[in-house]
From Swiss-Prot:
Top-rank taxon: Bacteria
Cysteine disulfide partners in this protein: none
Protein name: Ribosome-binding factor A
Species name: Deinococcus radiodurans (strain ATCC 13939 / DSM 20539 / JCM 16871 / CCUG 27074 / LMG 4051 / NBRC 15346 / NCIMB 9279 / VKM B-1422 / R1)
Family: Belongs to the RbfA family.
Oligomeric form and interacting partners: Monomer. Binds 30S ribosomal subunits, but not 50S ribosomal subunits or 70S ribosomes.
Lineage of origin: Bacteria, Thermotogati, Deinococcota, Deinococci, Deinococcales
Amino acid sequence: MSVPFRALRCRDEVAVFFLAAPGPLMKPEQVQAQMSRVLSSAIAELRDPRVPLIVTVERVHVTPDYGQARVYVSAIGADMPELLDALTHARGRLQRELSAHVRMRRTPTLEFHAADDQRFPAAPGSTW
């Protein structure tokens, strides 16, 4: 089975570009959902006393170029500035876990934010 390619002449050199076969591409929503699952389990494995036992990753928002990811977290009864500081301190380990479990060309830089009810309004028709 041959792979289609395109040859372009540039002065005396020939550059060959292999065209990728069309395949299933992951939509940004799918990438964000997978990142949320991986980060949830990675945060649960952190051994930092500033991180409570139950931390919820509410949402992950990735920029269109996948260069940065905003991770919105919440925890019941936790000191949020202290939690965000602990997660920022563990950013390298979390990014390594992310790169090991999510197939991406480049791993986005993580930014941690507190999840507010104002940023995430309730869905229409929800009872709480």
